[in-house]
Amino acid sequence: MSLRPDEVDVRILEENLLKTNTLVESMVASCQKISNSSYKAEITIEPISGMQRRMQVYETNLNNCLKVVDGIRDYAKVTAREEKIIRQGPEAVGLPAYVAAIQSVIRVNDEIEQRKLHSIPKVKEKAVDLARMGTSGLKENLATILKEESNPIDPVPILASGKPFPLMSPKNADKLNELMGIVARFSARQDNTYVDSRSRYLAMSLSPVASKVKPTVRTGKAPYDKQSNGIHIYAEALLKMLQAEHDNLRCAFPKDEARVKQYFTQLAQTPLQTYQAAGEEISNHVQRNISTDALLIFELIEGTVALKRGLEPLTNSAAPLDRLIQSSYNVSQGVFTEILKICEARVQQVMTLPSDNGVCDATVEVMSRIRRFAEYKDSAVLAISGMKYQQWIPQPRPAWMSTFSSAPAGYTTTKPQELLSAVFSDSIDAFYVTLEMKAKQLNPKKPSQVGFFLLTNLTLIERFVTKSEVYKVLGGQGRERLEKLRKRGLNLFLEGWKATASLLMDTTVVNSKGSLSSKDRELVKDKFKTFNADFEELVKNHKTYTITDPALKQLLAKEVAFICPLYHRYYDKHIGGDFSKNVDKYIKYDKAQFDRVLQELGD
């Protein structure tokens, strides 16, 4: 039976598939055999591979251990080597080698920490100890240099000589600069060796000066003598020493302005606080003893202000001085008032006037105080700058001011110089007017003598003014106020002369025939008699005055000469003799004689 072509192809394909299946089965069986063989090989080989890996780990660990051992051996060698150097000290081995040794042991410690080699604590401890020992050695070396430069000094002879205060040697300054920089690198905290050493130097040098400013209560009522306390020396010594310290810092740290500023602030703090405490003690003392030690407060202000101004270019940390200056200003305001009270009170102690109507002791004492006061004019100007005009006038208003004041009516000012001038003028007013009131009380019926007494004392007052700093303090306006006092004294002195001169004010009338009435004749006679008696009494009294000052003598003679033209006129009117047949009995002086008598008063 014959097959179609398609069937033949199918049959061939089936046969081929059958062969393929048989081949695949054979391959699967072979792969299974290979797999079984591989499994057996793996089981056999795996122990060998694991052992190899463990051997590699062992090898690595062993190498690491050997490296550690080598490292430990190296660290121990380093610390042993550097220990010899560090123990010798920087002076023996030199600073570079010494610093290198410290850096080396610090590096050992750092590496041990970084590698976490906790199994070698002794090596680490040794490195730490050596680093600490090395740093201490540097500080000791630093302290040695500072000690060499910090022997206490006595500032007083240096101030007296005008020489500059001692500075560190440039060589040691360079060493300090280097050492301080190294110590700063090796120290976690700021090292205070420099500040501590120089602070002790300042304290020990200034201590003897500071001990001499302690105020003491003095016996008696004598006023304070300038510079007898010593605060001015203390202030000047402190300034000069701090300026020298700043120069030292600039020399030691020429490129480190921040450190200069920091160290100087620290160095200045304690000395300034100590000075402030001494100043506050003086200020309190003045308040308790203001009648005798009032001027000491201006000496304190003067020294403290100079100290502050001297330190301003170096530091802005002078708060203790600011506080002291302000408290001193507050005390000084009471001193201005006290000066006026002293001037008035001293006059109240006067019981009698001098027999020659001359200068009284009170004038000398008061003007001596005012002269001393003027010596502190600069500090007084500073202190008064915060006051109002005449705030210093005692309350209640004193009697002298209600009687007379030489101050211009309605005057006021806020300028410190003018305020101080007003204080001095008011002080002189207080004394002069109170002296006038006292003189009138003791000698009520003789105004001319009172006037002469006042003018004599004013002459001494002016002498004190012109020969002292008072002249500068008063200025032009103060001198104008003195002139008002002079005019007041002259008016008193001339009262008797003016009363006598009033007799020459003729009220008589000459009739058309050139003659006087009988009543007027008698009046002229009485006037001449009275005038002659009064005039001679005035001249007699004038000649009894002890006038040692030529200028005053000439001034008084000039002032009384106002009567000359009045006498001349009266003389010319009546010399014809109409009022009397015996003219010489009433007219004792012709015009030339009269003028000569007055001229002799000025010779």
Curated annotation (Swiss-Prot):
Main location: other
Family: Belongs to the EXO70 family.
Main function: Involved in the secretory pathway as part of the exocyst complex which tethers secretory vesicles to the sites of exocytosis. Also plays a role in the assembly of the exocyst.
Identification of the protein by name: Exocyst complex protein EXO70
BP GO annotations: exocytosis; protein transport
Family matches, as SUPFAM superfamilies: Cullin repeat-like (SSF74788)
InterPro entries: Cullin_repeat-like_dom_sf, Exo70, Exo70_C
Pfam families: Exo70_C (PF03081), Exo70_N (PF20669)
Keywords: Exocytosis, Protein transport, Transport
Cellular-component GO terms for this entry: cellular bud neck; exocyst
Localization in the cell: Bud; Bud neck
Domain of life: Eukaryota
Record bears the keyword Repeat: no
Chain ranges passing through the membrane: none
GO molecular function term, any single one: phosphatidylinositol-4,5-bisphosphate binding
